[in-house]
């Protein structure tokens, strides 16, 4: 009885892996746009040039694909990214929205920001301050004018 059950399971497993049972993935045209149904919750914020910020590029693509008022035209899409090294995004429009994630960082201006995204917004809005992430300085809860010296 056990060998019959084992044989049935093996046959079912082999049949399930058979190329005749598994249909090939449909081929996409070269001009067809990638419209993901699901995205990983990975925090790597991007902006779309219209002031919208998304958790990552996948969520941005998904939003653009499902927004019927905005046809997805990836050729005209400008990604806005920043970094904690003071690099400015390629657009003059600064993002204003950050995910509600508590991951405190200290800026070179001695201001404590709730997360790296908030630091990037401050750096974008005040490029003259050249704000970057700085773990070597003491951070405070409110803005402190740096000591001149």
Curated annotation (Swiss-Prot):
Span of the signal peptide: 1-16
Any Gene Ontology biological process: effector-mediated suppression of host innate immune response
Protein induction: Expressed during host infection with the highest mRNA levels 3 days post-inoculation. EPI1 and its host target P69B are concurrently expressed during infection of tomato by P.infestans.
Subcellular location as annotated: Secreted
UniProt entry tagged with the keyword Transferase: no
Sequence ranges assigned to domain Kazal-like in this UniProt record: 29-86, 88-141
Keywords: Disulfide bond, Glycoprotein, Protease inhibitor, Repeat, Secreted, Serine protease inhibitor, Signal, Virulence
Domain of life: Eukaryota
Glycosylation sites noted in the Swiss-Prot or TrEMBL record: 67
Main location: secreted
Bridged cysteine pairs (disulfide): 35-65, 39-58, 94-124, 98-117, 106-139
Family annotation (Gene3D superfamilies): 3.30.60.30
Subunit structure: Interacts with host subtilisin-like protease P69B.
Name under which the protein is recorded: Extracellular protease inhibitor 1
């Amino acid at each position: 009885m056990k060998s019959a059950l084992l044989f049935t399971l093996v046959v079912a497993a082999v049949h399930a892996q058979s190329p005749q049972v598994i249909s090939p993935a449909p081929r996409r045209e070269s001009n067809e746009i990638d419209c993901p149904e699901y995205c990983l919750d990975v925090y790597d914020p991007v902006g779309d040039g219209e002031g919208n910020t998304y958790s990552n590029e996948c969520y941005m693509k998904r939003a653009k694909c499902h927004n019927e008022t905005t046809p997805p035209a990836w050729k005209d899409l400008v990604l806005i990214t920043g970094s904690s090294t003071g690099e400015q995004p390629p657009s003059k429009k600064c993002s204003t929205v950050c995910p509600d994630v508590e991951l405190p960082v200290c800026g070179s201006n001695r201001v404590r920001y709730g997360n790296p995204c908030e630091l990037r917004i401050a750096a974008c809005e005040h490029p003259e301050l050249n704000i970057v992430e700085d773990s070597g300085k003491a951070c405070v809860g409110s803005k402190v004018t740096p000591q001149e010296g």
